[in-house]
Amino acid sequence: MSTLKKPDLSDPKLRSKLAKGMGHNYYGEPAWPNDLLYIFPVVILGTIACVVGLAVLDPAMLGDKANPFATPLEILPEWYLYPVFQILRVVPNKLLGIALQTLIPLGLILIPFIENVNKFANPFRRPVAMGFFLFGTLLTIYLGIGACFPIDKSLTLGLF
């Protein structure tokens, strides 16, 4: 059973909306029941089947058993905390390291006020926001990679 709405292109209201880039919900395939009853369960059950199949075919080993009397040389946090760990490790004053980390959300809050343009505009036409984003992304990757190295090689990533 399929219900498909076809557009009535003789309707002047629909034509004016289509000219403005709107009105696309007047025609096409409805989400209920087609997507919600048929496609979503197939995707969900397929994902569960893939995860269970991979878990059965290749079970992950848990690794070595913990020895409370032998600690590693350097304890690293989880991978998503590497950039923060690197900032705290490299900055000589810990209070300054925490202050640097508070600048990140403050900078994100200030971006809309610095570049006051249409929020629906093409992101490539927003050079200040794109510059902040690219700089922040590259800095985060650099700090995350640097956290994996010993502290004497962490700033140069072992290249120099």
From Swiss-Prot:
Q: Where is the signal peptide?
A: none
**Which membrane topology term applies here?**
Multi-pass membrane protein
Q: Name one GO cellular component term.
A: plasma membrane-derived thylakoid membrane
Gene3D superfamilies under this entry?
plastocyanin oxidoreductase (1.10.287.980), Single helix bin (1.20.5.510)
Question: Does the record's keyword annotation contain Acetylation?
Answer: no
Q: What HAMAP family is this protein classified in?
A: Cytb6_f_subIV
**What family name appears in the similarity comment?**
Belongs to the cytochrome b family. PetD subfamily.
At the top level of its lineage, which domain of life is listed? Bacteria
Q: What does this protein do?
A: Component of the cytochrome b6-f complex, which mediates electron transfer between photosystem II (PSII) and photosystem I (PSI), cyclic electron flow around PSI, and state transitions.
Q: What is its main location?
A: membrane
Q: How does it assemble?
A: The 4 large subunits of the cytochrome b6-f complex are cytochrome b6, subunit IV (17 kDa polypeptide, PetD), cytochrome f and the Rieske protein, while the 4 small subunits are PetG, PetL, PetM and PetN. The complex functions as a dimer.
Fetch the InterPro entries from UniProt.
Cyt_b/b6_C, Cyt_b/b6_C_sf, Cyt_b6/f_cplx_suIV, Cytochrome_b_C_euk/bac
Listed name of the protein: Cytochrome b6-f complex subunit 4
Which NCBIfam families does the record associate with it?
cytb6_f_IV (TIGR01156)
Listed GO MF terms:
electron transporter, transferring electrons within cytochrome b6/f complex of photosystem II activity; electron transporter, transferring electrons within the cyclic electron transport pathway of photosynthesis activity; ubiquinol-cytochrome-c reductase activity
Q: Which SUPFAM superfamilies match?
A: a domain/subunit of cytochrome bc1 complex (Ubiquinol-cytochrome c reductase)
* Chain segments annotated as transmembrane: 36-56, 95-115, 131-151
Q: Where, per UniProt, does this protein localize?
A: Cellular thylakoid membrane
Q: Which UniProt keywords apply?
A: Electron transport, Membrane, Photosynthesis, Thylakoid, Transmembrane, Transmembrane helix, Transport
Q: Which residues form a coiled coil?
A: none
